[in-house]
């Protein structure tokens, strides 16, 4: 049986579109990644009507649902079994995510221990070799 979170509120994002950089559509050398405009005459900085919107504190998420995954858990990065056991009492609130640099041998032990402790692992299938390949 899969572990379910304590409660699963509806996660509301105030804005899902990305904020794009001013004039990034005009020049290829300007990437779309957001940069704050700092020019004295810049219309985006001065918030003229019809211009790109700037990110500000008002777009922030609800404090209760911030950093929450769609399944209702918050993820914690885990490098070894000892770090996994910290989540033992909080397994209905947090789920584990195995770090990128962990070897496939250690991943296997982490996933097995997580099943014993009934902790959900988000990337449990990653880099696990099957029997026929060995």
Curated annotation (Swiss-Prot):
Q: Could you tell me which cysteines form disulfide bridges?
A: none
Cite the entry's keywords alphabetically: Ribonucleoprotein, Ribosomal protein
* GO terms for cellular component: cytosolic large ribosomal subunit
Q: What is stated as this protein's family in its record? A: Belongs to the eukaryotic ribosomal protein eL32 family.
Q: Which PANTHER family match?
A: 60S RIBOSOMAL PROTEIN L32 AND DNA-DIRECTED RNA POLYMERASE II, SUBUNIT N (PTHR23413), RIBOSOMAL PROTEIN L32 (PTHR23413:SF1)
InterPro entries documented for this protein = Ribosomal_eL32 (IPR001515), Ribosomal_eL32_CS (IPR018263), Ribosomal_eL32_sf (IPR036351)
Keyword Hydrolase present in the record's keywords: the answer is no
Which Pfam families does the UniProt entry name for this protein? Ribosomal_L32e
Q: Which SUPFAM superfamilies match?
A: Ribosomal protein L32e (SSF52042)
- Organism equals Spodoptera frugiperda
Among the GO biological process terms of this entry, one is: translation
- State one molecular function term (GO): structural constituent of ribosome
User: What is the name of this protein?
Assistant: Large ribosomal subunit protein eL32
């Amino acid at each position: 049986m899969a572990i379910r979170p304590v409660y699963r509120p509806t996660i509301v994002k105030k804005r899902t579109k990305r904020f794009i950089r001013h004039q990034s559509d005009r020049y290829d050398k300007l990437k779309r990644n957001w940069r704050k405009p700092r020019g004295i005459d810049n219309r985006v900085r001065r918030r003229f009507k019809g211009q790109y919107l700037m990110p500000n504190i008002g777009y922030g998420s609800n404090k209760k649902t911030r950093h929450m995954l769609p399944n209702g858990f918050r993820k914690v990065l885990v490098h070894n079994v000892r770090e996994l056991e910290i989540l033992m009492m909080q397994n209905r609130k947090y789920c584990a995510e195995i770090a990128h640099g962990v070897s496939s041998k250690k991943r296997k032990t982490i996933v097995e221990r997580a099943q014993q402790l009934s902790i959900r692992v988000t990337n449990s299938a990653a880099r696990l070799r099957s029997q026929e390949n060995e």
